[in-house]
């Protein structure tokens, strides 16, 4: 109909230069172009639509002059001069509304249809193109709808699909088309997507709001949904508006025809921003406003704006057009139900009603749907709303009082038929809106009203809203409840998902999938974001956010980012929706599988998505999340996200300002960036995805979002210095930012982690970086919580948020910490990935959480939120926990990691690696719905990180960057000063950071952060301090580091666990082990163990990160792993040391191998860095490794040194086999560490060394190192346990551990080793990764059964891990595959490879460890015939564990968790990891081979 030919850009049709807007009509100019809002609320975005509209029966043509000259009356040229409206005009408009039967009917019909048109939403959704909106609206005119639908489809396809293939857009379009956005909504929606700022302005423009009939306010506020809905029928519009978001809802609440009141309220709401826009367009309008005001006001609108802008497809008009028709007929044709059903079909995923296809309208969908096509709109709109409004709401409320205004707006027009829609909308609104307490009032009323409106549109908005508010708030956790979220139940998967995702994804299918997928992921994200937004607003909300958010938000976060990322991925420019539509569908489908939380996500998504957070969140954090804050900026959710981000930004701003002076600018940038991010998140994320997204672009939505955000930020604001150009905008941005303030790292990190998440949403990177200074702080106080709660942390956000909040809500710093923590949780995945990619500095760091300096942190870090975001709520050890968590992929993590890595990457040409890492992180993040996935992701990230770390080793600068990254992580940890130790560590880290910041390039600096981190981990490092220092001295880069770190770390050395001497990267790895180990380590171990056990007993997942090289090895370990590590650590420190020693030995080999790979790939540079980075392990060991790694090919590694080489090679190979997969880099590091740890005085070491092809003296050196590492070994052992997969290599290297790992790795692994270089041999491992891995680790692996090269079992391990985490998420697998590469030399990665089932030398008595290392060189050999199935390995592991229990205090909870994990792994991996029987047999005696197959 009207959408017959919805122009892609409503503004396409430039009318005459000067125009007079007809009485009763509104002309809105937003980014998407010009929208004409008819008295009935229809949105016309182009002459085509106008013609269709005018020719459509039942459409309101009041106010048009008699001789109607379309070009004269309707000018769609945004630049055209418009006759200023006078008060008279306004009054005339009102009169028209009074006189216009359409307007009155619309209200009445909307109300009526709300109750009777549940199917419409379907219809809306159904409209395939994204004209779902239109469809619903059109339903009454089947024919018209069809044409509209087609047009819509076209338009949407063009504008929405092409522009932003996001279901969001579609949804928005649908919503728009459906109802109110005929012109406006779509444009608004599109605007939202495309040009949030503009749309906000335009839609949000007072014009929009003013169009009483149109529900001007709705136009203004919830421009898209509201507009559309209102335009075509209040009822319809309402729903759509409702779905659209709180703003819309508000608008809707006020019947669309409340143009004036709506307008007013909208204005009011939007006052901070654009008047109505903000409110109105939760997404579009708000976007506009947000964009514009985002900087000033952390307005959801801003976020929204971004979203819409992103979604730029003005062509939403097509949908709109459709909607207009339907809308026009909305009232008349409440009957569009027929079309709606298709919508439903299209939106199949909708929860309940067609309307809810998006699931956004779940609560209100039925009524709204029933209400009329508009209702359908709501469905589609719902999505939109979710995306937009919720985002907006979430964002907005926090961002501005406007939300309340918004809410009030609805209140103003309580009776309008869109109530049903409104309800949804309100729900969104409420949820989102609710977020802000202040805003909530209105929002509550309005939101509830809207949300509740479903029952009675008019239902007292206040009452309803209130109800809804209360309802939505907590249950939906804000974001998800916003649209559908308000109603928890409505917030069904569909609802939530639909809401958030749908908003993002135009297509139902995508939406469904995405939504469902995002339900989990997006929702949490959204929830997180919502929380972020809401947290500040309402204390309750944050709580809900934390709780719900955690559950829902996380998915939202992840999901959102994914969607958004997808969105962005597809639509390089803005159309998150478009992109989301296509990419999201595909990825979401995967993710959906991955996201068992889909329903949850959906629910959450609804609320969160309703906020638009889902998408937005996605953009925002994280993937990780989001990973999330970046989410905010995502496509449709971008609006909400933008709003959220806005809010976060504003809070960030405050906190950051307080917290970080320098980044004030950054904040501005960030803000801008976020705004831009919102506007450009898609491109950014798209870029990011394209850049590093190959494998897992959306895996970590949070990260992607963050990336997007960052990119967007970086694109639009380039806020991150030098980060703007990085294709991993996020990484770049963040990196740049991070890098920008390397010296400020501590501050920045603190902020970044915090902001990384909160702001992260906006600018994952920028945010991070900006967050660096400003953002993190802004969260710090209230925002942090919000951010944490909100998906701002990205995927981890929700969990991280919740965790972070609960974990580190202590002080601002704590706050930061909290934020960081959540961020970290996100980061862990998100940041982590980035880091991983970068150099694993951050990535591995995130892992550090569990084994972090403070064991408690470890404990806390145990929370690997469902999303797999390893929240690692390390309360005890925020630093470590935070660090790792900080690297959690969500934002801090990813952002962090990305930031840091990006920093280093960016600066050191490592942006791409980081991106891949980031991407890899993202997928993990998302898929990490399962901790497994997350862990794997982390691992993956770690591996890439290790790769980067290797690079960093190779490249001092890179190392520096990594260090910076690490520092960022550390700073993140600093962010979590709540832990004294962590604080100490932070201090140390900060010092290191300062050092690093000062000498980012110096390898030591690079080592420092990680070293610090690891030192935290490495309690043992003290003992090794002398050696370490010596080693450090030996190592050029390390020299400085040891001094610096030692100087800075010594204080924390004991306290933090082992901040001290173990400064060099290799020590970092050792530190990781040492963390648990060491004199302080013992206590630390106990503390960690207790924390882990505590967490385990609480059912939390503990993530233990182990990094051999402080630079690149901070690998997150799943709770199981953490528990294992703890268990290992529980045992004799020495025992652990021994085990770790063995592990490290093997691991070092693996690390070296990885380094070798790096060298192979990096050539000379690696050796050089090896000297620097590898020096991390030890000069001697380094040399040895250098020789073997750098110069030694597979052959050398395999057995160039026959005598020791044979055995060691075997062990090493085995070790490498896992490390190749698990920790290629860590393997390298490990070997170095092993060298450092001359645990096996000559035999084992030589054995290990031979694989390394090290000279005897080197071996001696290594032995020396090994001895030094003895204690570290224990820590390492724990770490290895933690990083079982990483340890797999190490274990493989270790005689027994090797065996254990061999066992872990199935025969396939050996086969892989045999295949060593067959990239395909690694099932899940990405071929390229595998290739590189094999290239580096594989060469020597080729001949070694257990070579570092990811063997099939290793690959399988990863694959199974992937499967465990996200069986259906290809990204996840890719991520996992990347992971191996990310490990740096000496990285003690967990080997979160899927297949990593057991940790060969997990818990063993020292003598056992020694024996194992020394006496089992052969044992280290993994022979295919000896490889056992995972089950066998698990059984053996269990036996060993039981036996080990005596030496290691494995607590029942831990044990149970381990058992569960093992069984789970067994199920998932099955025979994937066949542990060599010999190894297994040998290993059983060795408890250290704990299988933490998490």
UniProtKB/Swiss-Prot annotation:
Domain of life of the organism encoding this protein: Eukaryota
Effect of residue 144 to I: In MRD1; uncertain significance
UniProt entry keywords in alphabetical sequence: Chromosome, Intellectual disability, Nucleus, Ubl conjugation pathway
Tissue expression per record: Detected in heart, placenta, liver, skeletal muscle, kidney and pancreas.
Documented effect of changing residue 857 to T: In MRD1; uncertain significance
Biased composition (Basic residues): 1483-1494
Chain spans, region Required for interaction with ASXL1/2/3: 57-68
Domain MBD: 11-81
Limits of the PWWP domain: 1385-1409
Comp. bias intervals (Low complexity): 499-511, 594-612, 836-848
SMART domains per UniProt: MBD
Any one of the GO CC terms: chromocenter
Region (Disordered): 123-152, 200-274, 329-350, 450-522, 594-641, 809-848, 1154-1173, 1345-1375, 1468-1494
Polar residues bias: start-end ranges: 614-624, 813-835
Miscellaneous: Named 'methyl-CpG-binding domain protein' for homology to other methyl-CpG-binding domain proteins and the presence of an MBD domain, MBD5 and MBD6 may have evolutionarily lost the ability to bind methylated DNA and are recruited to heterochromatin by alternative signals.
This protein's domain notes: The MBD may lack methyl-binding activity.
Function (record text): Non-catalytic component of the polycomb repressive deubiquitinase (PR-DUB) complex, a complex that specifically mediates deubiquitination of histone H2A monoubiquitinated at 'Lys-120' (H2AK119ub1). Important for stability of PR-DUB components and stimulating its ubiquitinase activity. As part of the PR-DUB complex, associates with chromatin enriched in histone marks H3K4me1, H3K4me3, and H3K27Ac, but not in H3K27me3. The PR-DUB complex is an epigenetic regulator of gene expression, including genes involved in cell growth and survivability.
Identification of the protein by name: Methyl-CpG-binding domain protein 5
């Amino acid at each position: 109909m009207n959408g017959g030919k919805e122009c892609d850009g409503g503004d396409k049709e430039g009318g005459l230069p000067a125009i007079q807007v007809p009485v009763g009509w509104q002309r809105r100019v937003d980014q998407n172009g010009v929208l004409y809002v008819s008295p009935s609320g229809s949105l016309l975005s182009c002459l085509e639509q106008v013609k269709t509209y005018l020719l459509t029966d039942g459409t309101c043509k009041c106010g048009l002059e008699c001789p109607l000259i379309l070009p004269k009356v309707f000018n769609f040229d945004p630049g055209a001069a418009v006759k200023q409206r006078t008060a008279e005009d306004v009054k005339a408009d009102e009169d028209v509304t009074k006189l216009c039967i359409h307007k009155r009917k619309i209200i009445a019909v909307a109300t009526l249809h709300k109750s009777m048109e549940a199917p419409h939403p379907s219809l809306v959704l159904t409209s395939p193109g994204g004209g779902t909106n239109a469809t619903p609206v059109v339903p009454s005119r089947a024919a018209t709808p069809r044409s509209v639908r087609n047009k819509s489809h076209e338009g949407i396809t063009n504008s929405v699909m092409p522009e932003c293939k996001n279901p969001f857009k579609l949804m928005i379009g649908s919503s728009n088309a459906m109802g109110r956005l005929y012109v406006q909504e779509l444009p608004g929606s599109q605007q939202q997507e495309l040009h949030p700022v503009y749309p906000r302005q335009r839609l949000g423009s007072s014009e929009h709001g003013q169009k009483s009939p149109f529900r001007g306010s709705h136009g203004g506020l919830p421009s898209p949904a509201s507009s559309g809905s209102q335009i075509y029928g209040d009822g319809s519009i309402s729903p759509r508006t409702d779905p659209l978001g709180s703003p819309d809802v508000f608008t809707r609440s006020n019947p669309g025809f409340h143009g004036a009141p709506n307008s007013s309220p909208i204005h009011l709401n939007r006052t901070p921003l654009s008047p109505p826009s903000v409110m109105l367009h939760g997404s579009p309008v708000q976007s506009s406003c947000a964009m514009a005001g985002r900087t000033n006001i952390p307005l959801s609108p801003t976020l929204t704006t971004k979203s819409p802008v992103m979604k730029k497809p003005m062509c939403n008009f097509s949908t709109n057009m459709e909607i207009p028709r339907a809308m026009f007929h909305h009232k008349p044709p409440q009957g569009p139900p027929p079309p709606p059903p298709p919508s439903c079909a299209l939106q199949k995923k909708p929860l309940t009603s067609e309307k809810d296809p998006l699931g956004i309208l779940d609560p209100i969908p039925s009524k709204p749907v029933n209400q009329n096509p508009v209702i359908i709109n709501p469905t589609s709109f719902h999505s939109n709303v979710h995306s937009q409004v919720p985002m907006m709401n979430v964002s907005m409320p926090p961002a501005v009082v406007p939300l309340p205004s918004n809410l009030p707006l609805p209140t103003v027009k309580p009776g309008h038929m869109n109530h049903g829609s409104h309800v949804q909308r309100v729900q969104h609104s409420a949820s989102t809106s609710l977020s802000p307490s202040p805003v909530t009032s209105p929002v509550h009323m309005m939101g509830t009203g809207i949300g509740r409106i479903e029952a009675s549109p008019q239902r007292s908005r206040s009452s309803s809203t209130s109800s809804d508010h209360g309802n939505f708030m907590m249950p939906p956790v804000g974001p998800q409840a916003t649209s559908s979220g308000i109603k928890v139940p409505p917030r069904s998967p569909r609802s939530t998902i639909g809401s958030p995702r749908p908003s993002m994804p135009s297509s139902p299918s995508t939406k469904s999938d995405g939504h469902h997928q995002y339900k989990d992921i997006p929702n949490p994200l959204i929830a997180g974001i919502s929380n972020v937004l809401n947290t500040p607003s309402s204390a309750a909300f944050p709580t809900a956010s934390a709780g719900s958010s955690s559950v829902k938000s996380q998915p939202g976060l992840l999901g959102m980012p994914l969607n958004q990322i997808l969105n962005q991925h597809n639509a390089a420019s803005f159309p998150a929706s478009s992109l989301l539509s296509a990419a999201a569908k595909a990825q979401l489908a995967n993710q959906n599988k991955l996201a068992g939380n889909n329903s949850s996500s959906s629910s959450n998504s609804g609320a969160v998505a309703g906020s638009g957070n889902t998408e937005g969140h996605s953009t925002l954090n994280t993937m990780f999340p989001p990973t999330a804050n970046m989410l905010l900026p995502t496509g449709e959710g971008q609006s909400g996200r933008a709003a959220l981000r806005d809010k976060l930004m504003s809070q960030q701003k405050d906190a950051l300002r307080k917290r970080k002076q320098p980044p004030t600018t950054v904040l501005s940038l960030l803000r801008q960036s976020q705004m831009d991010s919102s506007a450009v998140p898609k491109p950014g994320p798209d870029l990011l995805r394209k850049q590093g997204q190959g494998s897992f672009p959306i895996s970590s939505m949070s990260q992607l979002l963050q990336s997007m955000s960052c990119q967007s930020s970086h694109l639009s604001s380039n806020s991150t210095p030098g980060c703007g150009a990085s294709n991993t905008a996020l990484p770049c941005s963040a990196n740049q930012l991070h890098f920008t303030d390397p010296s400020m790292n501590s501050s920045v990190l603190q902020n970044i982690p915090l902001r990384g998440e909160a702001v992260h949403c906006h600018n994952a990177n920028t945010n991070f970086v900006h967050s660096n200074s400003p953002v993190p702080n802004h969260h710090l106080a209230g925002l942090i919580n919000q951010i944490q709660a909100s998906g701002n942390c990205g995927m981890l956000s929700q969990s991280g948020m919740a965790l972070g909040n609960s974990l580190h809500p202590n002080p601002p710093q704590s706050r930061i910490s909290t934020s960081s923590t959540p961020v970290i949780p996100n980061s862990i995945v998100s940041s982590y990935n980035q880091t991983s990619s970068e150099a694993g500095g951050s990535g591995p760091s995130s892992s550090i959480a569990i084994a972090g300096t403070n064991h408690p942190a470890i404990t806390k870090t145990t929370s690997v939120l469902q999303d797999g975001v390893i929240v690692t709520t390390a309360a005890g050890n925020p630093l470590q926990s935070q660090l790792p968590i900080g690297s959690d992929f969500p934002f801090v993590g990813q952002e962090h990691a990305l930031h840091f890595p990006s920093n280093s990457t960016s600066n050191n040409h490592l942006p791409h690696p980081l991106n891949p890492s980031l991407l890899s992180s993202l997928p993990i993040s998302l898929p990490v719905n399962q901790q497994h996935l997350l862990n794997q992701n982390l691992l993956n990230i770690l591996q890439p990180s290790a790769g980067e770390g290797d690079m960093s080793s190779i490249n001092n600068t890179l190392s520096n960057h990594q260090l910076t990254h690490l520092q960022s992580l550390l700073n993140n940890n600093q962010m979590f000063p709540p832990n004294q130790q962590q604080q100490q560590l932070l201090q140390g880290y900060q010092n290191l950071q300062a050092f690093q910041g000062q000498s980012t390039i110096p390898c030591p600096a690079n080592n420092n952060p990680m070293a610090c981190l690891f030192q935290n981990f490495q309690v043992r490092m003290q003992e090794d301090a002398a050696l370490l220092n010596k080693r450090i001295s030996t190592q050029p880069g390390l020299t400085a580091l040891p001094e610096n770190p030692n100087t800075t770390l010594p204080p924390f050395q004991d306290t933090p666990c082992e901040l001290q001497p173990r400064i060099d990267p290799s020590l970092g790895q050792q530190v990781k082990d040492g963390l648990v180990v060491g004199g302080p380590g013992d206590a630390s171990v106990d503390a960690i163990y207790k924390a882990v056990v505590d967490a385990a007993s609480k059912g939390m997942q503990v993530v233990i990160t182990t990094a051999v090289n402080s630079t690149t090895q901070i690998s997150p370990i799943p709770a199981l792993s953490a528990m294992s590590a703890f268990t290992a650590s529980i045992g004799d420190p020495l025992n652990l040391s021994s085990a770790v020693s063995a592990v490290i030995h093997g691991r070092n080999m693996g690390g070296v191998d990885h380094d070798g790979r790096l060298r192979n790939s990096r050539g000379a540079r690696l050796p050089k860095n090896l000297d620097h980075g590898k020096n991390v392990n030890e000069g001697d060991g380094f040399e040895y490794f250098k020789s073997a790694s750098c110069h030694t090919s597979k052959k050398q590694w395999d057995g160039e040194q026959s005598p020791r080489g044979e055995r060691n090679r075997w062990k090493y190979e085995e070790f490498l086999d896992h490390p190749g997969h698990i920790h290629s880099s860590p393997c390298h590091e490990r070997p170095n560490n092993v060298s450092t740890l001359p645990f096996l005085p000559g035999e084992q070491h030589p054995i290990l060394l031979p694989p390394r092809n090290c000279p005897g003296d080197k071996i001696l050196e290594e032995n020396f190192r090994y001895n030094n590492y003895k204690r570290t070994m224990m820590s390492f052992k724990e770490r290895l346990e933690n990083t079982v997969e990483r340890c797999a290599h190490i274990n493989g290297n270790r005689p027994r551990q090797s065996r254990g790992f061999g066992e872990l790795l199935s025969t396939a692994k050996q086969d892989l080793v045999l295949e060593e270089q067959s990239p395909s041999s690694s099932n899940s491992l990405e071929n390229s990764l595998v290739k590189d891995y094999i290239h580096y680790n594989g060469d020597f692996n080729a001949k070694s059964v257990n070579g570092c090269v990811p063997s099939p079992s290793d690959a399988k391990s990863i694959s199974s891990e992937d499967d465990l985490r996200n069986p259906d998420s290809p990204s996840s697998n890719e991520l996992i595959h990347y992971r191996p590469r990310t490990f740096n030399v000496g990285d003690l990665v967990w080997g979160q490879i899927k297949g990593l089932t057991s940790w060969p030398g997990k818990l063993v008595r020292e003598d056992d460890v020694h024996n194992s290392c020394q006496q089992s060189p052969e044992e280290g050999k993994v022979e295919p015939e000896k490889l056992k199935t995972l089950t066998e390995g698990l059984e053996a592991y269990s036996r060993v564990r039981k036996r080990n229990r005596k030496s290691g205090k494995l607590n029942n909870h831990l044990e149970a968790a381990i058992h569960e994990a093992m069984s789970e792994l067994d199920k998932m991996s099955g025979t994937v990891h066949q542990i060599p029987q010999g190894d297994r047999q040998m290993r059983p005696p060795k408890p250290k081979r704990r299988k933490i197959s998490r």
